[in-house]
């Protein structure tokens, strides 16, 4: 050693990293033995100093960082602003979550960065500080949790909890923080147990892939290499990683500086030579790697490089494959034990920001950017290419280049201040990011009615459900209102807008109501627990119920009529068709069969012309069994109900009805069983069975007869035909038709005897084979259609006598076509004939153009007896009825009960009392999700608020012009509430509604641009012409709501003119909260404009939810939602967190070459793209060779980058060589393709790339193949040794396949020799002379063959040579630091 006087003294703190570097340099200079002696001295010195210092750790040593208070306060302030934006509907839940996480993560990081300087200044000898930064115990993250803040935690699923733990462990946690903290602690313990086994299994699979790779030669003779460059177009490679990549490698080419050769080919690189090359500033260095080795199942010394143990070239016989597998798998085992130390604390990255260096004005080219939303919901500009941004100050012009795919957060010509963020560079534009697709469910905070403000489409997988896709960013609105269950409807059947007393009974949401009625009485069956828990089916006592009624008045608005078929009695009046119910006061239980008249009313309550109003199912035409219908060939008119097409249900099946002019029809019974394809049938086709014979395991036959089995798609149809079987003689003439009906009285020939038939029979010829046939005689049921059965006997006669407006006709319909089979489901009966009552109305009157009538229920209570009516009224155009002057009682069509929509029905007086009360609740009825019951939405005064009076309000002059044209139309003080206009439109017509979010508009705004077309269910706001009605009973005023707007005048006093900035408020418009509509006026709350008056508006409060394109909305428009119901599902991408708990699955995912649940870059898709493009450019024979090789090179580099990124993020250093050996094995196979068939390999066969190339050269013809990526499991099962495969997985399958193919195992690998107890071909068992001799012999044979090369092969070799040069140059541009 040098003399002590010449030694250099380094006064530095040595931490763990410095110790590693010191040991490495000592080994390079002095060797192993001397280095161990020096390290012993260092160890002794350390123990002596630690004993003298006698450090102890007390709670007083944990000093909280002083700046923590204001940092946390600032983060809370940002979170509060974010919460307000979310409440106003400016950002949605996912954007809020992202921004909240980044706010708290940044706060936590600032605290962690301040921790070290704080300790250094205040207490440099603090034991906590000394321990954590010496590497002896703990690290900066753990100390940060002790003295900073714990920060954000992950839940057991790896999702982030957006409530941060603001305390540290020194201050102590609150109860909530402790529970959240337990998530991470438990997660660590569980991960330690589970991930250890995962890491062990990963190691086993890795070793399995590469166990046979042994160093068997010194030089394979390859001329290829991979270029490594310290400089890259994206960023500089760190010098440490560059040195780490080069040390221990072998050069693939000479390195020249000028004309001087500083390093030659096949020279191994040590630390000295690498430092010299860095000093010279060499641009790119070509090195040999396991990728470039020409061997198939082994590796040469020069391609591997130096041994990691002693620093010299690797020895022959070294089992480098097993070393590589252990090197990658073992850190995974170790890292799982480290997870719980950070206790599931979230670690992530924030985006890089570009800040303005000083105050100035921003200038950039607006054509190169387009507006977008950032992931936090902020408005920004996205640039696709490098964008030059100029900041102009008074005397300085500064230019900044923004990289592609970055967000520009400022506008052109905007003034910015110093240090203001002007751009956000998106992280990971140059690296492969592990992202996963996450679903975020948003639940409704309150109950109410759902609206949306854009067109929606059905999600493709939910075509028949209530899930819709949003095509663009829009708001979802939950309009306020309380809900009430459906059992309330049973005693509150009223006309729309009626006021009524609602009984305060406890109502369950899931109560079922049904009606069953015959001609004499109406019984209502309850299947709910509203009245008595013990009695499940009971008829309520109406007088008792009326005694329990509350005193609150509500306003009833609903349009959906009962879905159940209600049976009614009918009575007729002049312009309305009123059918009264009859109610029963007895409390006895009544179960009346469903044999009465059923009335079919569409959901929307609208009948079209010639639609079926009521029907009667006669029990005589009802069958339990399946069969076939037969009748004559008279005229049959197919009729489809129009209402069925209008009904809004999930899946609507249309049942065709046949109007028959026949007097009888025939029913041929048969037993039918529809069985799944996999069913075990215990009877044979064309066999004869008796009654109660077992057909399958669970099914027995109901009748005896002939079995007929038909196999159809995915099902088996088994029919049993009852009847007699006859084998006729040859002389008998049997009809070859499928079957004929024989009437009674005719004879049939059977055994030369003649008989007379008593009943109709059905003769069917059955042919089991071509030569054999027999006749099956089946019984027939005959049905006579009697004319006397019609509804005239069931309804009062005056229904059919009056001919004013509405006409009723009676028809008989056969529900099945001639020869059509009828199928009964389980135990249900089949109705064959239906007697229907068809509605029509007089077309000779003035209102002949009307094609619709409307039906609604009315209930009148008189002295405790409740009468229910169904009223059918013609829809008329109300604009033709204008009130006559000086005649307040005459109001045209609007009769007494229409005069005021707020009228109540008193249970005592029995007459309609008109009363106009303030603040009555408005009740709307909606479809429930099960489509069987209904819900009421109660809108009371607490859900609405009034804003006004306003100043500077100006009505648009369109109204004044319309008044001049028609002086009869007057404007009253109040325009009625939205939704309470008289129903005059079809609910299913397309209704225009104003829904937009712009509030302040300069000058006049064309309202046509703001209209969206909706298909609205249950909506009766505006008719097709956009009219809405004033509900003042004495003034029938018709106004156009699209012209009924307010304009607020804002004076601009700086100029001598008045600029008209119009803020438009329209009926039905939605407002977000905190919007100021006029100066010095109050801010609006979020809601929908319900009433527009001269000086004020009434707004129904609503909660907006912002949703972005691609979100899935659960529910229909105007459907009622309860608190906690799923409102919308967001699908977004998020980076997976960086802990090794999720890092290990990432490594496994890359090595298995599969995408589990992430949407990360899938290499298999890239491979397909490469193959297609290269083949298209170069043609088939050239393209496959070059395409496969290019693809393999690209995928290898990408895979190495990904695996290294995971391990480096954990601070684990693994040499690239180990990863390259693994990746080489999983990318070394190609798939023989069908183009250009070869005699050697089968299409779809997996062969090695080098083997394919050599075979092609030997055969002097091209073999077409494609590159494939095998995972480590598939690669282990596709080796040359079947013993190795069988000992890994699927032993029986592998051995059976090998036996059938006659495979030979040459026992070249380590594992198969271990299994059979032989000497392993590695280390001392490696036979050097034999291997070399055989290899040289093979080379001589190949050289003899290559003398006869064809022109094609020479061209191919040249192309491949140039391709390699191209490949090497392209790789040199890439960042090898990620390899």
UniProtKB/Swiss-Prot annotation:
The record's free-text note on cofactor binding: Binds 1 Zn(2+) ion per subunit.
GO MF, any single term: zinc ion binding
Pfam families per UniProt: RNA_pol_Rpb1_4, RNA_pol_Rpb1_5
Location relative to the cell: Plastid, Chloroplast
GO cellular component: chloroplast; DNA-directed RNA polymerase complex; mitochondrion
Keyword set includes Zinc: yes
Residues where Zn(2+) binds: 220, 293, 300, 303
Catalytic activity: RNA(n) + a ribonucleoside 5'-triphosphate = RNA(n+1) + diphosphate
Superkingdom of the source species: Eukaryota
Leader sequence residues: none
Cofactor(s) annotated in UniProt: Zn(2+)
UniProt keyword annotations, A-Z: Chloroplast, DNA-directed RNA polymerase, Metal-binding, Nucleotidyltransferase, Plastid, Transcription, Transferase, Zinc
Keyword Iron applies: no
GO biological process, one term: DNA-templated transcription
Enzyme Commission code(s) on record: 2.7.7.6
Main location: plastid
Family annotation (InterPro entries): DNA-dir_RpoC2_beta_pp (IPR012756), RNA_pol_beta''_euk (IPR050254), RNA_pol_Rpb1_3_sf (IPR042102), RNA_pol_Rpb1_4 (IPR007083), RNA_pol_Rpb1_5 (IPR007081), Rpb1_funnel_sf (IPR038120)
Top EC class of this enzyme: transferase
The family this protein is said to belong to: Belongs to the RNA polymerase beta' chain family. RpoC2 subfamily.
Biological role: DNA-dependent RNA polymerase catalyzes the transcription of DNA into RNA using the four ribonucleoside triphosphates as substrates.
Quaternary structure and interacting proteins, as annotated: In plastids the minimal PEP RNA polymerase catalytic core is composed of four subunits: alpha, beta, beta', and beta''. When a (nuclear-encoded) sigma factor is associated with the core the holoenzyme is formed, which can initiate transcription.
Protein name: DNA-directed RNA polymerase subunit beta''
Gene that produces this protein: rpoC2
């Amino acid at each position: 050693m040098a003399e002590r006087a010449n030694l250099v003294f380094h006064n530095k703190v040595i931490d763990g990293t410095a110790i590693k570097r010191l040991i490495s340099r000592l080994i390079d200079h002095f060797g192993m033995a001397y280095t161990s002696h020096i390290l012993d001295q260092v160890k002794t010195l350390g123990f002596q100093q630690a004993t003298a210092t006698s450090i102890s750790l007390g709670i007083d040593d944990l000093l909280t960082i002083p700046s923590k208070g204001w940092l946390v306060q600032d983060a809370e302030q940002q979170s509060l602003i974010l919460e307000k934006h979310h409440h106003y509907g400016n950002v949605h839940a996912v954007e809020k979550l992202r921004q909240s996480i980044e706010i708290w993560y940044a706060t936590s990081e600032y605290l962690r960065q301040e921790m070290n300087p704080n300790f250094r200044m205040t207490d440099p000898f603090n034991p906590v500080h000394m321990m954590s930064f010496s590497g002896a115990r703990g690290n900066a993250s753990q100390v940060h949790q002790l003295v900073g803040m714990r920060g954000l935690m992950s839940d057991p699923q790896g999702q982030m909890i957006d409530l941060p733990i603001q305390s540290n462990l020194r201050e102590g946690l609150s109860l909530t923080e402790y529970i959240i903290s337990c998530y991470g602690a438990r997660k660590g313990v569980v991960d330690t147990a589970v991930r250890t086994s995962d890491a062990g299994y990963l190691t086993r699979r890795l070793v399995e892939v590469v166990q046979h790779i042994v160093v068997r030669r010194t030089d394979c003779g390859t001329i290829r290499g991979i270029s490594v460059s310290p400089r890259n177009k994206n960023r500089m490679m760190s010098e440490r990683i560059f040195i780490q990549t080069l040390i221990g490698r072998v050069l693939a080419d000479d390195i020249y500086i000028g004309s001087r050769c500083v390093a030659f080919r096949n020279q191994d690189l040590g630390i000295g030579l690498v430092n010299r090359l860095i000093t010279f500033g060499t641009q790119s260095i070509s090195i040999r790697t396991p990728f470039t080795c020409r061997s198939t199942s082994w590796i040469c010394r020069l391609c591997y490089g130096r041994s990691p143990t002693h620093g010299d070239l690797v020895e022959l016989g070294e089992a480098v494959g097993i070393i590589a597998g252990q090197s990658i798998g073992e850190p995974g085992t170790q890292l799982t034990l480290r997870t719980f130390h950070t206790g599931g604390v979230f670690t992530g990255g924030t985006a890089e920001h570009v800040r303005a260096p000083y105050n100035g004005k921003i200038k950039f080219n607006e054509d190169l950017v387009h507006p977008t939303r950032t992931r936090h919901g902020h408005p920004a500009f996205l640039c696709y290419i490098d964008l030059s941004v100029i900041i102009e100050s008074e005397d300085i012009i500064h230019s900044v280049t923004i990289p592609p795919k970055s967000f520009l957060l400022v506008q052109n010509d905007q003034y910015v201040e110093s240090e203001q963020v002007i751009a956000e560079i998106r992280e990971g534009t140059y690296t492969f990011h592990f992202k996963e697709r996450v679903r975020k469910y948003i639940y409704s905070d309150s109950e109410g009615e759902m609206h949306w403000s854009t067109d929606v489409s059905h999600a493709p997988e939910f075509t028949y459900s209530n899930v819709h896709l949003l095509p663009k960013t829009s708001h979802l609105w939950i309009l306020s209102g309380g809900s009430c269950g459906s059992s309330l409807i049973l005693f509150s059947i009223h006309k729309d807008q009626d006021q009524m007393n609602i009984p305060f009974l406890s109502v369950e949401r899931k109560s079922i109501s049904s009606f069953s009625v015959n001609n004499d009485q109406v019984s209502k069956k309850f299947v709910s627990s509203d009245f008595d828990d013990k009695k499940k089916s009971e008829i309520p006592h109406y007088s008792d119920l009326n005694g329990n009624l509350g005193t609150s008045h509500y306003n009833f608005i609903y349009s959906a009529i009962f879905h159940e078929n209600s049976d009614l009695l009918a009575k007729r009046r002049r312009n309305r068709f009123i059918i009264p119910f009859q109610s029963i006061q007895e409390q006895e239980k009544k179960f009346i069969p469903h044999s009465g008249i059923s009335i079919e009313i569409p959901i929307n309550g609208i009948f079209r012309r010639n639609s079926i109003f009521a029907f009667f199912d006669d029990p005589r035409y009802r069958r339990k069994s399946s069969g076939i219908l037969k009748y004559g060939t008279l005229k049959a008119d197919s009729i489809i109900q129009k209402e069925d097409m209008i009904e809004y249900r999930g899946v609507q099946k249309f049942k065709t009805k046949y109007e028959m002019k026949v007097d009888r029809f025939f029913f041929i019974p048969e037993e039918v069983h529809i069985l799944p394809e996999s069913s075990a049938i215990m009877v044979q086709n064309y066999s004869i069975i008796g009654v109660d014979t077992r057909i399958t395991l669970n099914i027995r036959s109901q009748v005896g007869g002939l079995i007929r089995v038909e196999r159809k798609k995915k099902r088996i149809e088994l029919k049993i035909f009852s009847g007699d079987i006859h084998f006729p003689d040859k002389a008998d003439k049997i009809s070859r038709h499928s079957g004929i009906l024989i009437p009674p009285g005719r004879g049939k020939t059977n055994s030369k005897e003649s008989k007379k038939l008593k009943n109709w029979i059905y003769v069917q010829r059955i042919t089991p084979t071509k030569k054999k046939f027999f006749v099956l005689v089946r019984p027939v049921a005959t049905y006579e259609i009697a004319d006397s059965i019609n509804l005239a006997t069931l309804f009062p006669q005056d229904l059919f006598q009056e001919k004013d407006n509405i006409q009723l006709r009676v028809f008989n319909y056969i529900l099945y076509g001639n020869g059509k089979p009828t199928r009964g489901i389980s135990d249900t009966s089949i109705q064959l004939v239906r007697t229907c009552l068809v509605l029509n109305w007089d077309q000779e009157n003035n209102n002949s153009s009307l094609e619709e009538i409307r039906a609604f229920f009315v209930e009148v209570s008189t002295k405790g007896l409740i009468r229910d009516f169904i009223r059918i009224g013609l829809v008329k155009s109300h604009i033709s009825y204008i009130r006559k002057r000086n005649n307040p009682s005459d109001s045209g069509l609007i009769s007494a009960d229409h005069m005021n929509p707020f009228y109540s029905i008193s249970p005592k007086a029995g007459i309609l009392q008109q009363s106009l009360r303030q603040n009555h609740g408005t009740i709307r009825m909606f479809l429930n999700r099960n489509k069987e019951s209904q819900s009421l939405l109660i809108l009371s005064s607490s859900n609405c608020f009034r804003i006004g009076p306003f100043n500077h309000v100006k009505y648009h002059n369109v109204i004044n012009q319309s008044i001049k044209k028609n002086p009869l139309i007057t404007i009253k003080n109040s325009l009625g509430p939205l939704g309470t206009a008289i129903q005059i439109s079809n609910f299913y017509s397309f209704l225009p509604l104003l829904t937009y979010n712009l509030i302040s508009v300069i000058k006049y705004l064309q309202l046509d641009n703001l209209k969206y077309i909706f298909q609205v269910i249950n909506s009766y706001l505006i008719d097709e012409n956009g009219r809405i009605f004033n509900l003042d009973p004495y003034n029938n005023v018709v106004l156009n709501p699209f012209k009924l707007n307010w304009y607020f005048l804002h004076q601009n006093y700086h100029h001598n003119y008045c600029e008209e900035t119009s803020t438009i408020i329209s009926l039905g418009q939605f407002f977000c909260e905190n919007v100021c509509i006029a100066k010095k006026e109050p801010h609006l709350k979020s809601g929908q404009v319900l009433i527009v008056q001269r000086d004020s508006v009434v707004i129904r409060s609503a909660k907006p939810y912002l949703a972005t394109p691609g979100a899935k909305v659960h529910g229909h428009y105007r459907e009622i939602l309860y608190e906690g119901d799923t409102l919308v599902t967001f699908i977004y991408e998020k980076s997976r967190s960086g802990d090794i708990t999720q890092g290990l699955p990432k490594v496994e995912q890359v090595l298995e070459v599969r995408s589990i649940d992430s949407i990360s870059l899938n290499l298999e898709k890239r491979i397909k793209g490469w193959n297609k493009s290269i083949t298209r450019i170069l043609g088939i024979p050239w393209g496959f060779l070059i395409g496969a090789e290019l693809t393999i090179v690209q995928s290898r580099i990408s895979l190495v980058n990904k695996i290294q990124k995971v391990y480096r993020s954990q601070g684990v250093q693994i040499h690239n060589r180990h990863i390259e050996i693994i990746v080489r094995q999983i990318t070394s196979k190609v798939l023989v393709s069908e183009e250009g068939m070869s005699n050697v390999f089968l299409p779809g066969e997996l062969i090695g790339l080098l083997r394919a190339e050599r075979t092609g050269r030997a055969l002097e013809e091209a073999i077409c193949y494609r590159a494939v990526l095998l995972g480590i499991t598939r690669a282990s099962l596709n080796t040359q040794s079947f013993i190795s495969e069988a000992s890994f997985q699927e032993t029986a399958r592998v051995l059976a396949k090998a036996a059938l193919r006659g495979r030979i195992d040459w026992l070249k690998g380590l594992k198969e020799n271990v299994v059979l107890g032989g000497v392993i071909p590695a280390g001392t068992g490696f036979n050097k002379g034999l291997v070399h001799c055989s290899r040289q012999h093979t080379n001589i044979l190949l050289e003899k063959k290559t003398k006869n090369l064809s022109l094609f092969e020479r061209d191919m070799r040249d192309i491949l040579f140039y391709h390699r040069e191209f490949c090497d140059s392209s790789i040199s541009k890439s960042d090898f630091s990620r390899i």
